[in-house]
Amino acid sequence: MASSTPSSSATSSNAGADPNTANLRPTTYDTWCGVAHGCTRKLGLKICGFLQRTNSLEEKSRLVSAFKERQSSKNLLSCENSDRDGRFRRTETDFSNLFARDLLPAKNGEEQTVQFLLEVVDILLNYVRKTFDRSTKVLDFHHPHQLLEGMEGFNLELSDHPESLEQILVDCRDTLKYGVRTGHPRFFNQLSTGLDIIGLAGEWLTSTANTNMFTYEIAPVFVLMEQITLKKMREIVGWSSKDGDGIFSPGGAISNMYSIMAARYKFFPEVKTKGMAAVPKLVLFTSEHSHYSIKKAGAALGFGTDNVILIKCNERGKIIPADLEAKILEAKQKGYVPLYVNATAGTTVYGAFDPIQEIADICEKYNLWLHVDAAWGGGLLMSRKHRHKLSGIERANSVTWNPHKMMGVLLQCSAILVKEKGILQGCNQMCAGYLFQPDKQYDVSYDTGDKAIQCGRHVDIFKFWLMWKAKGTVGFENQINKCLELAEYLYAKIKNREEFEMVFDGEPEHTNVCFWYIPQSLRGIPDSPERREKLHRVAPKIKALMMESGTTMVGYQPQGDKANFFRMVISNPAATQSDIDFLIEEIERLGQDL
C-alpha cells in the first residue's frame, strides 16, 4: 500500500503525541481517506467503508464521494497496457528538452510517447468537460489581426527548426482556447453542432488507424461498415435492400455534385469520354431557397450557372410545382434538354420541405432525374413522428443525407445514396492498375475507391457506425424528436411577444426558427423602407455584441428582400429549454438599447 503524508493541520494537532503512534491514529477521517487514495480502488473503498461505520450519513457520503472523485481523476491519466501487467501512469516530465524526434518510433521513445499523449488526453478531457459547462464561454473572440500578431505566446507562424514538446502542448491548449466550442449547449450558429462522446471516441480511433477507404485490402473493417450502414440508410429512405449504391463524401456540396454527375452519366454516358460538347444543351432545376452547392456544381461540371434554373417558392420556402412544370416547358421550347430536378428536404434558412410527391410526378412525366437534398432534413427519416415531412423521398433517384447535421455525428459525415446500382462506378471508374487489380485474392467489388471522384478518401464511417451501435435507431429518433420539441418551445415562447416578429406565419417544419428582434426604438412603427433599413442593422449589431461577450452564438441572414433576421437552429442533443430561455434573454439584453 502506498503511503500518504498526513496534512499539516493533523500533524500540528498531534505535536505532543507519541511519534510512533501519530501516523497510526490520524485525528481526522480525511487523513485516513488520504491514505485510501494511495491504495488500489478495491482496498481504498474498504478503508472508506470501515471509516463510515460510526459516521453520519452525510459524512459517509462525503468520504466515498471524495474517494471516488480522486480515483476517477487519477484514472483519467492512466490506461491499461494490454501487453504488460502494469499501467501507463502520468509522471512529471520535462517536455522543454524533448522534441518530436524523441517520440516513437525513436529508440527508447515509448515512455516519452506515453507521457506526451497523456498530456494531450488531459488537454482534451478538460476541453470536453468545459464544453458542457454552461459557465464556460462559447468562444473567446479575437479579431484576425490579434491572432496573427500573437496572443500570450500563441504564434501561428511556422518555424524552420523544431520546437519543443512543451511548446507543442501549449499550442494544443491555445488552439482550443481561441477556437469556438461548437459542442457547447448554447452554440446555435450552424446546422452542425454538438459533441457526441461516442463519436469522439470513434474519431480518435479513426485517426489512430490512419487508413484510406479506396480498397478493401487496406481498410477491410471500415469498408464493410460503410456498406452495411449505407444499405441501412437506403432501406430507411424506402428503397429495396437489394439494389442501390452510395458512398460517404466530404460534405453535402460534394454529395449533391455526385448526384448531378450520376444523372448526366445515366442519360448521356458518352459525356465521360467526349465531354460536354458531345451532349445537348442541358439544364438543371432547383428552388430559389435551395443550397448554393447546386449552382456551384453547375459551374464546376460545365453546365454553367445560367443553366441552373431557379424555381419560385411560396412564403414558407417550398417549391411551387406549377412553376417547376412551366419552367421545364419553357426550357424545352428554347431548345434545351431538361435533365435534373433538385428537391430540398430541409432548406438551409427556413427549414422547408419541398413537396416531393408532386415534384416526383413532374419528373416522371418528363423523364427527369429527381434528387432530394436531405442534407439537413434527412435525419427526420429516423423519426416515426416526423418522417412524413419527406413523403415521396422513396421515388427519388438519389438522396443526399448528412448525419453530421441533425444526427449529431462529428464532422465530416455525408452520404450520397443512389437508387440504381452501378451508376457511381460507371460514372467515375478509371481502373487505376496500381490500386484496383482485378486478380486480387478477394472479391474486388469491395474496392470502393473507383466509385469516388477522389482517390484518397477519409474514413468517415467509424464514428457514425459506433454512434448507431451505441444509440440504436431508437436513440437517434429520441434525439431528433427532442430537438424538434425545443424548436416548438422557442416558437411558442416568442410568437406573441412585442419584442419579436416571426419571419413567416405558422409553426416551423424543422428546427429552424426565423425571427426579428424588435428593439424599443422600432416597436409600434409602421412598416416602411426606413424601418426596414434600421431593422436590417439590428441582428448584425446584436451578433457582434454576442460574439464579443462569448455567451452564445446564433446565426442571422437576409432572405430575398427581407431585412436581416435571426435563424435559430437546434441540432445539439445537449441543448435544453433553459438554453433557449438564455438565448432569448441574451438577445433582449444586448439589443435593448439599439
From Swiss-Prot:
Pfam families: Pyridoxal_deC
GO CC annotations on file: axon terminus; cell cortex; GABA-ergic synapse; inhibitory synapse; perinuclear region of cytoplasm; presynaptic active zone
InterPro entries attached to this UniProt entry: PyrdxlP-dep_de-COase (IPR002129), PyrdxlP-dep_Trfase (IPR015424), PyrdxlP-dep_Trfase_major (IPR015421), Pyridoxal-P_BS (IPR021115)
Enzyme Commission identifier(s): 4.1.1.15
Cofactors: pyridoxal 5'-phosphate
GO MF assignments: glutamate decarboxylase activity; identical protein binding; pyridoxal phosphate binding
Keywords: Decarboxylase, Lyase, Neurotransmitter biosynthesis, Phosphoprotein, Pyridoxal phosphate
Family: Belongs to the group II decarboxylase family.
Name by which UniProt lists this protein: Glutamate decarboxylase 1
Subunit note: Homodimer.
Sites bearing N6-(pyridoxal phosphate)lysine, chain numbering: 405
Record CDD domains: DOPA_deC_like (cd06450)
